[in-house]
């Protein structure tokens, strides 16, 4: 896993860099674990834009990922490590002893031919999944459940992980990558280790076209819009504070303070200046 830097034979390639894909062992996905993926173009069921700056991009097929790791006690062998266009992390194809195949997020350090297992009583080893209450303090984990049996929801991007820092009663305290300290029930599953492809953040697109291939459209500043399109539009802003297209002031927290899970946040994440 490394970064391939292009020679500056053109303006676009001067700053372009991509992954060297050294860890990839197969280029075609497992046919039984692939589903069609329809593009929305950022539109909702009324055809209205509900998410800006989305559209176009290369056609993709969805790889069905096992976020639950609920096949307990059955040893699986890592058959292949593959590229997934739908996420920043790589995925690993597991072949279980009973013949079933499943995709999981590729943990850092796992190679083709390694074995993993999930369930209570599993060894604390990279790639194994177990309840958080059985994970030793100081251990890095990823693909963490927030609700028992729902499947992993936290620490799934390339290079991410959370650290087990405390245990008290039924809950385990985790330090997330955002520096947030959060309580998670001890029976929630998590996978030992970090997510692979940690060099993902070092890549540079080099040209606007690369973003378009990924389905990302341009971000237009509010100041260059018309007054009907944005509060900052039309000649000058007039000394107004930076706001969103809907008039919300920059940096205002939008999370509902009465949300039930608010009590599980021991310490909020560190916040920098929001950008518009």
UniProtKB/Swiss-Prot annotation:
<dbReference type="InterPro" id="IPR005880">
    <property type="entry name" value="Ribosomal_uL2_bac/org-type"/>
</dbReference>
<dbReference type="GO" id="GO:0016740">
    <property type="term" value="F:transferase activity"/>
</dbReference>
<comment type="function">
    <text>One of the primary rRNA binding proteins. Required for association of the 30S and 50S subunits to form the 70S ribosome, for tRNA binding and peptide bond formation. It has been suggested to have peptidyltransferase activity; this is somewhat controversial. Makes several contacts with the 16S rRNA in the 70S ribosome.</text>
</comment>
<keyword id="KW-0699">rRNA-binding</keyword>
<feature type="compositionally biased region" description="Basic residues">
    <location>
        <begin position="254"/>
        <end position="276"/>
    </location>
</feature>
<dbReference type="GO" id="GO:0015934">
    <property type="term" value="C:large ribosomal subunit"/>
</dbReference>
<dbReference type="InterPro" id="IPR008991">
    <property type="entry name" value="Translation_prot_SH3-like_sf"/>
</dbReference>
<dbReference type="GO" id="GO:0019843">
    <property type="term" value="F:rRNA binding"/>
</dbReference>
<dbReference type="GO" id="GO:0003735">
    <property type="term" value="F:structural constituent of ribosome"/>
</dbReference>
<comment type="subunit">
    <text>Part of the 50S ribosomal subunit. Forms a bridge to the 30S subunit in the 70S ribosome.</text>
</comment>
<dbReference type="GO" id="GO:0002181">
    <property type="term" value="P:cytoplasmic translation"/>
</dbReference>
<dbReference type="InterPro" id="IPR012340">
    <property type="entry name" value="NA-bd_OB-fold"/>
</dbReference>
<keyword id="KW-0689">Ribosomal protein</keyword>
<dbReference type="Pfam" id="PF03947">
    <property type="entry name" value="Ribosomal_L2_C"/>
</dbReference>
<keyword id="KW-0687">Ribonucleoprotein</keyword>
<dbReference type="InterPro" id="IPR002171">
    <property type="entry name" value="Ribosomal_uL2"/>
</dbReference>
<comment type="similarity">
    <text>Belongs to the universal ribosomal protein uL2 family.</text>
</comment>
<feature type="compositionally biased region" description="Basic and acidic residues">
    <location>
        <begin position="29"/>
        <end position="47"/>
    </location>
</feature>
<keyword id="KW-0694">RNA-binding</keyword>
<dbReference type="InterPro" id="IPR022666">
    <property type="entry name" value="Ribosomal_uL2_RNA-bd_dom"/>
</dbReference>
<feature type="region of interest" description="Disordered">
    <location>
        <begin position="29"/>
        <end position="53"/>
    </location>
</feature>
<dbReference type="InterPro" id="IPR014726">
    <property type="entry name" value="Ribosomal_uL2_dom3"/>
</dbReference>
<dbReference type="Pfam" id="PF00181">
    <property type="entry name" value="Ribosomal_L2"/>
</dbReference>
<feature type="region of interest" description="Disordered">
    <location>
        <begin position="199"/>
        <end position="276"/>
    </location>
</feature>
<dbReference type="InterPro" id="IPR022669">
    <property type="entry name" value="Ribosomal_uL2_C"/>
</dbReference>
<feature type="compositionally biased region" description="Basic residues">
    <location>
        <begin position="207"/>
        <end position="219"/>
    </location>
</feature>
<protein>
    <recommendedName>
        <fullName>Large ribosomal subunit protein uL2</fullName>
    </recommendedName>
</protein>
<dbReference type="InterPro" id="IPR014722">
    <property type="entry name" value="Rib_uL2_dom2"/>
</dbReference>
């Amino acid at each position: 896993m490394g970064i391939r830097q292009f020679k500056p034979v053109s303006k676009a390639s001067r700053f372009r860099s991509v992954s060297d894909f050294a860890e990839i062992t197969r280029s075609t996905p497992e046919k039984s674990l692939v589903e069609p993926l329809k593009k929305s173009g950022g539109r909702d069921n009324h055809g209205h834009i509900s998410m800006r700056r989305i559209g176009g991009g290369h056609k993709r097929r969805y790889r069905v990922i096992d976020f639950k790791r609920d096949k307990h006690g059955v040893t699986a062998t890592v058959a292949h490590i593959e590229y997934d266009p739908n996420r920043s992390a790589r995925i690993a194809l597991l072949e279980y002893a009973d013949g079933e195949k499943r995709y999981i997020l590729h943990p850092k350090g796992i190679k083709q031919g390694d074995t993993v297992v999930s369930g209570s009583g599993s060894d604390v080893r990279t790639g194994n999944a177990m309840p958080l209450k059985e994970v030793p303090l100081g251990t890095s984990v990823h693909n963490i459940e927030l609700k028992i049996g729902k499947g992993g929801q936290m620490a799934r991007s390339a290079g991410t992980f959370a650290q087990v820092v405390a245990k008290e009663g039924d809950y385990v305290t985790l330090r997330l990558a955002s520096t947030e300290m959060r309580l998670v029930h001890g029976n929630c599953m998590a996978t030992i280790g970090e997510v692979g492809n940690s060099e993902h953040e070092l890549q540079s697109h080099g040209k606007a076209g690369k973003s378009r291939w990924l389905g990302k459209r341009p971000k237009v500043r509010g100041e260059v819009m018309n007054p009907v399109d944005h509060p900052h539009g039309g000649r000058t802003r007039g000394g107004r504070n930076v706001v969103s297209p809907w008039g919300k002031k920059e940096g205002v927290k939008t999370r509902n303070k009465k949300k039930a899970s608010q009590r599980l946040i021991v310490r909020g994440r560190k916040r920098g200046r929001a950008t518009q």
